[in-house]
Amino acid sequence: MGVWLHFGYVRRRKLYILDSMIKTAYTCFSTDVIHEGHLNIIKEGKKYGRLIVGVLSDKAKVRSDRFPVIPFEERFEMIKNIDGVDEVVEQNNVLYDEVINSIKPDYVVHGDNWNEYPDSIIKENVIKNLSKYGGELIEIPYTYNAKVLKINSIMREKLAMPEYRRKRLRQLLNLCPIVKVIEAHSGISGLIAEKTIVERNGELDQFDAMWVSSLCDSTAKGKPDIELVDISSRMRTLDDILDVTTKPIILDGDTGGQAEHFAYNVRTLERMGISAVIIEDKIGLKRNSLFGTEVEQTQDTIEAFCNKIKAGKEALRTEEFMVIARIESLILEQGMEDALKRAFAYVEAGADGIMIHSRRKTPDEVFEFCDKFRQREKQTPIVVVPTSYSQVTENELVQHGINIVIYANHLTRSAFPAMKNTAVEILKNHRAKEVENNIMPFNEIIKLIDEL
């Protein structure tokens, strides 16, 4: 009996030693569809030992990559069922610190298509973490062929389709602590919103959605912001942006016009794939809210504005499009109680979100509104536009229950001074050499604009 115990111990000891000698390889996928490039990485990775594949979480994917067409759970199962994969784990950050420190793989296997910013940040992060214990990076030549490129193109085009884009704002509200929205007023500004990714404090980040502002749309056309640019022209701008981007769009709907007209416009926006429209509770000639009481502005009655909200909601054919009510009580100095009274009434009428606006230089009254609103209404999204109180951080907004922050006019306001300065310098110097260092190189323009 003792001999058998001895042999059993020896056998287990040998297996333990063999297990400890087996190398571990790790790779991570964020893809929604497996093509031969991924299969090649799995095949090559398997040569180095036991292969663990990380699947990037939905929350991490929206910070650094395209929005997931397939949810994490389905992507996890898809990878799990591929031959050659020994284990599948969730990767919760696009950078590898956490997963490498946890698994300590002998090798990280990746395609060689990550040498340009921002992907180069991920590569540097992997090398840094592997160097801590002598791990090795294995780069596999990326599979460039017509089939792979076609699959990538189809997945991008799928994200741009109305039925996928329209619902994405609601999905982002469930994934992100705060949805970050940047203004776009043309196809090129839409591409900037779409493609800008930064690295900060060890994380990659990007904007989640785009805001098509009536102010910026009017300014780009050289017209005043008084609803002079009609809805047909606004929709042409939307179409230009929709044509070259995939991110969800929120439209600045001004007052929404007549309730009967608003219903038809909502139906059109929903069909186009717009995610939301924000309408303000004012009537009469539209004037920019940041003028406040310096110009004549008239607030709509609660009853009439509720009827407009209801008209828009009743026109919808899906539950994906959002009608968001913008409250002007603080702008027009009608007081906090009026703002809250309106907010609760608008939610009762069917508003999918509340935007509270202020022209104060500090966020105090906005925070007071949000705190009081949240005491009673826990779920309805709150939207803010911190144009006048720009010092506030997104983390501060989250602490007060705010769900969406819109940087409403900043691409327009930064573009025009740059263009004016270029014009001045050329006139002053009678040549263009002096502006060369301040303008975009041609190769960057080419990279920004996608070809079919």
Where on the chain are the PLM-derived regions?
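Alpha/beta enzyme core
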Residues: E163-P248, G253-I382, V392-H400
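Receiver (REC) domain switch/active-site residues of two-component response regulators
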Residues: G49, D86, D106, D208, ...
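Short, basic, helix/turn surface patches
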Residues: N81-D83, D112-N125, E136-Y142, T237-D243, ...
